[in-house]
Amino acid sequence: MGDNYSTYLLDIEGTVCPISFVKETLFPYFTNKVPQLVQQDTRDSPVSNILSQFHIDNKEQLQAHILELVAKDVKDPILKQLQGYVWAHGYESGQIKAPVYADAIDFIKRKKRVFIYSSGSVKAQKLLFGYVQDPNAPAHDSLDLNSYIDGYFDINTSGKKTETQSYANILRDIGAKASEVLFLSDNPLELDAAAGVGIATGLASRPGNAPVPDGQKYQVYKNFETL
């Protein structure tokens, strides 16, 4: 089913790891840190340059604005940058490990060309794949899958995931023909956008994913073992 492709483009949440990981682990970890980040911000702090880009001087208003962006899941590039900074500390301190599916780990290791495309920043993507919970080891052990991944794309490098032009940009950047690429995601709007430039698509059907209307029109993958 997936043997006809030389290149694979993968979504993250709901595709290679549970969709709940972001909303139940990453987002709460970030929002719990926001008050401290804002209240302790100084000109010399590492986050000062990021927070200043919001152009909100009042700390209470700034905190409320950031939390509102998170609550509404707004794909704001400044927010993504701030989240990347906070999550880096979480991963590096061992407080966060990414629960990547075992079949996805095996898939990434055995395929020659694998690229990642997520609305999360490239920095956040590299952190996630750098601190993967090892399914065959104790809870404190982690895997670094970054050496198996050929490249990363986000909304800043390529555009929104629901826009066809974004996938044309990715094809250009990786030097591949559309017919050589299979894109896997749990979001049908993203699949339709990729199909607009001729990329083959597959709908990831993982536990906890939202039901997809007209799902029968997509090639469905419950895991990556058949690829």
From Swiss-Prot:
* Protein name per its UniProtKB record: Enolase-phosphatase E1
Could you say which cofactors this protein requires? Mg(2+)
The UniProt entry lists the main location of this chain as cytoplasm
Family annotation (Pfam families): Hydrolase
Its quaternary structure?
Monomer.
Q: Which family does it belong to?
A: Belongs to the HAD-like hydrolase superfamily. MasA/MtnC family.
Q: Which reaction does it catalyse?
A: 5-methylsulfanyl-2,3-dioxopentyl phosphate + H2O = 1,2-dihydroxy-5-(methylsulfanyl)pent-1-en-3-one + phosphate
> Which NCBIfam families does the record match to this protein?
enolase-ppase
Q: How is the cofactor bound?
A: Binds 1 Mg(2+) ion per subunit.
Annotated GO biological process: L-methionine salvage from methylthioadenosine
Keyword entries, A-Z: Amino-acid biosynthesis, Cytoplasm, Hydrolase, Magnesium, Metal-binding, Methionine biosynthesis, Nucleus
**EC top class, as a word:** hydrolase
Q: Name one GO cellular component term.
A: nucleus
Lineage top rank: taxon: Eukaryota
**Residues that, per the record, bind substrate:** 118-119, 161
User: What Enzyme Commission number(s) does the record list for this chain?
Assistant: 3.1.3.77
